[in-house]
Amino acid sequence: MIQSQTFLNIADNSGARKIMCIRVVGTTYQKYAYIGDIIIAIIKEVVPNTKMEKSEIVRAVVIRTSKEFQRDDGMRIRSDDNAAIIIDQKGNPKGTRVFGPVLQELRQWNFTKIISLAPEVL
């Protein structure tokens, strides 16, 4: 579960390393973001000599959470960290590589580009 003020690792090569969630995109009463949800975040840590800047406001999609995710068949999947991928306004990732596994449920939520870049799909 990702809420406001939560720090997330970045799982792509867009230039940011850590972001902090400031808002969950969607309804006004939704407090938490889960896997596949879009958040608005601030970049807190960047890789040197990249286009991204610290304190820049970006949109990101959550791909891994420490809180377990339960599939329809009852299987629960949990990750070691909270991770996200920075996206543009159209939903395409800004990076060209994705690090770490992603869930196959992202395909249902129209993030097929992220699925195709991922090295492992669970």
From Swiss-Prot:
Biological process annotations from GO: translation
Cited HAMAP family: Ribosomal_uL14 (MF_01367)
UniProt keyword terms in alphabetical order: Chloroplast, Plastid, Ribonucleoprotein, Ribosomal protein, RNA-binding, rRNA-binding
InterPro entries noted in UniProt: Ribosomal_uL14, Ribosomal_uL14_bac-type, Ribosomal_uL14_sf
GO molecular function, one term: structural constituent of ribosome
Gene Ontology, cellular component aspect: chloroplast; cytosolic large ribosomal subunit
Main location: plastid
Function summary: Binds to 23S rRNA.
Presence of the UniProt keyword Chloroplast in the record: yes
Name of the molecule in the record: Large ribosomal subunit protein uL14c
Subunit structure: Part of the 50S ribosomal subunit.
Subcellular location: Plastid, Chloroplast
Stated family: Belongs to the universal ribosomal protein uL14 family.
